[in-house]
Amino acid sequence: MNIKRILKVALYTTNASDVGQMYIVLGIVALIIGSVNAALIRDQLSFNNLNAVDYYDAVTLHGIFMIFFVVMPLSTGFANYLVPRMIGAHDLYWPKINALSFWMLVPAVILAAISPLLGAVDLGWYMYAPLSVETTVNYGLGTNLIQIALILSGLSSTLTGVNFVMTITKMKKVPYLKMPLFVWGFFTTAILMIIAMPSLTAGLVFAYLERLWGTPFFDSALGGSPVLWQQLFWFFGHPEVYILILPAMGLVSELLPKMARREIFGYTAIALSSIAIAFLSALGVWMHHMFTAIDNTLVQIVSSATTMAIAIPSGVKVLNWTATLYGGEIRYKTPTILLISFIVMFLLGGITGVFFPLVPIDYALNGTYFVVGHFHYMVYAILYALLGALFYYFPFWSGKWYNDDLGKTGAILLVAGTFLTATGMSIAGILGMPRRYAVIPSPIYDPFQFMASVGAVLTGIGLFILAGVLVHGVFRGRAVNGVDPWDNISVKLQDFFIKPVKLPLSFGKSLDGAFDEEYHGIKFPYYSVLGLFLSFIPLGFMFILIGLIPIGIVLLLAFMGVGLYWGYDQWFKPMQPPPHFYADGGVPVTNSVNNSISPSLGIASMRDARSAVLWFILAEVILFGSFIGGYAFIMSPVTNPLSYVNNIVPAVEVFPLPAIMTAILLSSSIPAHIAYEYFKKGNVKMFRNLGLLTMAMGLTFLGGQIYEFTHYIHFIPQDSAASSFFFATVSLHGFHVIMGLVIWAFMMLRIRKGFIPYAGSVAATYYWHFVDAVWVVVFSTFYLHLIV
């Protein structure tokens, strides 16, 4: 395949297999960037060649790249490549949104990579406030670019999570308890993405606004709290640990039996343990990261207990993996070494992690390199699993073999190097070496930091050999005979539900490898361009807020132009009204090419759309919960005892305008609901008329809010953290009202063109009810002050 063909496929494709391969390539590029920053860290701690600013920049980028832009894209890449093949789906549920999700991540990686060129990013991957919001140490725009990059990454991950949940629940051709274990692993990961990412997005929005606009969400002097950032971040951060490791566990569960040539031992227990891990990780485990920040014994006990409990399902997996190996005929190949090393390193990570639920020990170790060592044991284990999968599926992807002897050499060097690095860090931490220091504070730690640096060199050599083995395999590898490279059929093990017709299953190929993939009739690469241009929204507002208004407006208009052209060209231009559309109150009697879906399929699509909208609403509930919960946090003397008194409670008039507008908005759910009921009975005409009434009431509400903000509100967001939350939360709700109106307008225009919006009717109605329900909470909190 030549370069021109590769670029064309990359820009136009919506095929999950192709998108998955692009995720993997992006993850490998990010791995190189993250590794360069790791080398800078080791150089500073070994030879003191950097200044403090450059060192902390490297620490920040290394952590952010490895977590957000290496492990997550690689896991998502394997999910795109494998899940449809494993469950018999022809693609993901939303192929176009899948492509959009990938292309949103590309500018995120670019912005994060160039961020130190535009200002200091001395944050750490956890970006704690107030360091992340002040502009003296972290001067320039670098930190803003990091925040924008991670907002884009979070939105991409949320869309991906909903897409995979819908794909697995609606398109699988195998029963749940027959699904491959990797599918189970990523299914639970997708649910955690939906739950965890919105709180990080909320925190990043607060930090973005505080840096650029002076809204004091985290400023104690004005009623804010730096601990609020920790709550929001770690509510995301600990589920994120399992977002990282559950796909790796799934790959190990999937591939270990192939290498042991026997069925997995304890399939049901492993599948259910994934659910248990996901459930426990979202309960209260995140607060064990904050034992030194929370002075509440009950909270510490609950968090400690749930943290200990999560070891049980993890132990179930390890026992079953070990039993699988015990009864198998193990093939000592490159993937085998990496998969077994995963188990060993995961155990070491678990053993070092056992100390942290014990509050007194956590107090002693929390600020030391022992935490860094523990985390590296876990992340290195994840890396082994991902590389093991890469080597296992390489013959399927390329149709060629690699040099397995060299592969095993590289794998052994990688494992030895990573073990030395993580162990050196852990010993230094046990001896008390503090983390986040640019200079080693005592010579007692030198041998162990040197040990970590030697390990890093071995790790680099191992990765270099493994990369060379794969590159050599692509160009000079021996061809695979048949379509079962690992001879799994002979032991009745199955790699895919969609069996390959021929190899390779490479870029631009169909799921079975039989033919080159088409582009779904796309004449312009809308989803790649839209994904790239989405970054223009936060970038545009950034330029506006720093005073470069023309640049900001140009960026915003560029995105709007592409979006409007896409909507017209893809959704309205090709549509021709059918000759007979309505009869007897709006029942459709004939269909055009654009409306060829049968009523039975239309009803089925409505059921699917309801599930999809409810998953989106779950993410939205977490987002609004982060905003409203953040307000409750800074206003409470229990959670913000030192600075809650510095808040100025927004004095907002309830009568007459806000009360009237609230009544209008809440009443708009009535015509919306009746419209939906008419639609289900086939009366599209009444659906249209009542939908227009709903829109009119929504527009009236927005108009009333604009008038309220310009005539009734006499305070500004910068007055206090409370006023910042008022403006941020009410504006967020207003944005969602606009989104709801856009969906309704879209439905009305499609109906006018003669299209029956089966799925769209569900999306418009359910989402509008959600927007109205959220306003009840917002109005009660900020206008009636019933919650705080």
Curated annotation (Swiss-Prot):
GO cellular component, alphabetical, reads: plasma membrane
Q: Which cofactor does it need?
A: Cu(2+); heme
Q: Which UniProt keywords apply?
A: Cell membrane, Copper, Electron transport, Heme, Iron, Membrane, Metal-binding, Oxidoreductase, Respiratory chain, Transmembrane, Transmembrane helix, Transport
Gene3D superfamilies associated with the record = Cytochrome c oxidase, subunit III, four-helix bundle (1.20.120.80), Cytochrome c oxidase-like, subunit I domain (1.20.210.10)
**Cofactor descriptive note:** Binds 1 copper B ion per subunit.
InterPro entries the UniProt entry points to: Cyt_c_oxase-like_su1_dom (IPR023616), Cyt_c_oxase-like_su1_sf (IPR036927), Cyt_C_Oxase_1 (IPR000883), Cyt_c_Oxase_su1_BS (IPR023615), Cyt_c_oxidase-like_su3 (IPR000298), Cyt_c_oxidase_su3-like_sf (IPR035973), Cyt_c_oxidase_su3_a-hlx (IPR013833)
Q: Where is this cross-link: 1'-histidyl-3'-tyrosine (His-Tyr)?
A: 238-242
Q: Which GO terms describe its biological process?
A: electron transport coupled proton transport; oxidative phosphorylation; respiratory electron transport chain
**Is Metal-binding included in the keywords of this UniProt record?**
yes
The answer to whether the entry has keyword Secreted is: no
- Annotated positions binding heme a3: 374
- Domain of life per record: Archaea
Citing just one GO molecular function, the answer is: cytochrome-c oxidase activity
Q: In which pathway does it act?
A: Energy metabolism; oxidative phosphorylation
Q: How is it modified after translation?
A: SoxM is probably a precursor form of subunits I and III.
**Annotated localization:** Cell membrane
The residues the record assigns to binding Fe(II)-heme a are: 62, 376
The residue range of the signal peptide is none
Subunit: Forms a complex with at least SoxC and a 30 kDa Rieske Fe-S protein, but neither with SoxA nor SoxB.
What is the name listed in the Swiss-Prot or TrEMBL entry for this protein?
A: Quinol oxidase subunit 1/3
Gene name per UniProt: soxM
